[in-house]
Each structure stands twice: as structure tokens, then as C-alpha cells.
Amino acid sequence: SRDLKSGIEKATEKVVAYLEKTSTSVKGDMIDQIATISTNNDAKLGEIIGDAFRAVGETGVVMMEPSAEAETKVKIVDGIQYEKGITNQHFITNQVNKTAELENASVLLVESPIENIRQIQSILEHVIKNSIPLLIIADMEPAVAATLAMNKTKGNIKVNVINAPTFGINKREVLDDLAMLTGATVVNEDLGDDMDLIQPEFLGKCLKSITNEKDTIIQVEELSDQVLEAIEDIKIELSETQTPGNLIRLEKRLARLSAKIAIVQVGANSDIELKEKTDR
């Protein structure tokens, strides 16, 4: 009801105000100090990790990967942290980290449920013929997911499936933002798209995707003009809105579209040293 909605919004305002009043921001050298303690008092590594967090800001993501060189350094890329994780253990490619990883993959975004494998037959034929990995963000029938997992296990295709966003309006916004970032077109039966045979022209692309149990990191190429324009529009809308619920929604969109990913490339002189560093 309207009264319930109003009450929730007022409670949200009070909780946010209390948290802002009682919280302590981690800034400047404090980041280095925390990172140094977390890496067994390795000041140099702590400083590198601190630099990574400063580079991406509050909305960014910091992750790490092994480097082929002895030096540890930070690489900044554009990308997004999408809050959906592994859907099937057979999609895992990195058994050590328990992650599903794809490089230079095509991206398929589907808002309507995929009910049978024939609906994506043209997509599968396209990526298999051209040896392109495929990231699917969609809800689908278990039988479809099982068929894809089986073909991935047999080595017929490099594929990963993660669920579509969960809720109504937010679902469409998240998919639209993912579409802008990857260059894909969202397949939506409600808008007249033919779900009987989804075509390759709907596909976008990403440089890399890493899916763990909880979420997925999607690295993309340099942000397009469309994304940059959307970011500016959201900033204007943020400055004009007064509704707490709308503020939260817009802030999430802004973070999603403008976020950076810092990759700490961990260098070492041996496999033993590399394992010891990454374990920290």
C-alpha cells in the first residue's frame, strides 16, 4: 500500500543517515595499511593493492590473476560486477578457483525464458563454427542448461550460462545496461522479438568473464559514446530526484555503467612464490 511504501522510504532515510554518521571512511594511507596487514605485513604489496582500490574508487572491483612476469602490477579495465553466479558446476573451467572463465566471448542477453534448445540453435551454430566462446545471460529450462553443460563437458563448445536479473523494472534496466556495455541487443518476446529462432545479430561481446559462486565479472572494451551519454543523463537525473528509492536505483545504475575493474597481476620468480603471494 501507499502508507507502507512511504514508511519504508522514511525508514530507509533514517538508516542511511545513521550509517553515514557512525561510519568511518577508509581513505588515503588507511587503504595501504589495511592491505599491508592483510598481506602479512608486505608493505610493497599492500601499496600496490591500495593503488588498485584508489584507481577504481568506491564503485569499482579489485581482482587478481597470475602474471607471466616477476613484477606485480595493476591493470585497469572497463567492466561490470553482475550479481549472479555459477548455475551449473559443469560450466567451471578453473578448478582451483572454482570459476567459469571465458575470453573474447560473444554475449547473449535474453529477457524472455529460453524454453528449448532450438530457440538458440542459430546462435550455437554460429559460435561453434567460428570457435567463439559464448556467455548467455538468461533464464532457461533445466533441460536446455543441461544440454549446454553436456556439450561444454564434451568439448563441443565453450559456454557459460548465468541467470537473468530477478525483478521487473530493475531486470529490464540491468539487461539494458549490460547491452550498452557489451554491444548486445536484448532479446525480448514482449517487444516482438522472435523467440523461435534467435539470430547471431543479437550478440554482443566481452573481453573476459569470470563467474564464481556469487557473481560475475564482465570485462568490456573502452566505454562507448552511448554508455558515456547514459552516465551523464543519470548524473543529471540524480541531481533532480528527491525520492530515496529512485536515488538508490539511479546510484546503482551509475555505479554499474561507470565502474572500473582493477586487476592485480601477481608476479613471482617461481610457482611456489606465486602460490604464497596469491594465498595472502
Question: Which role fits each region the language model picked out?
Answer:
Residues 1-11, 15:
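Hydrophobic, well-structured modules enriched for small/aliphatic residues and gly/pro motifs
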Residues 13-280:
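Long, structured protein-protein interaction/assembly regions in large complexes
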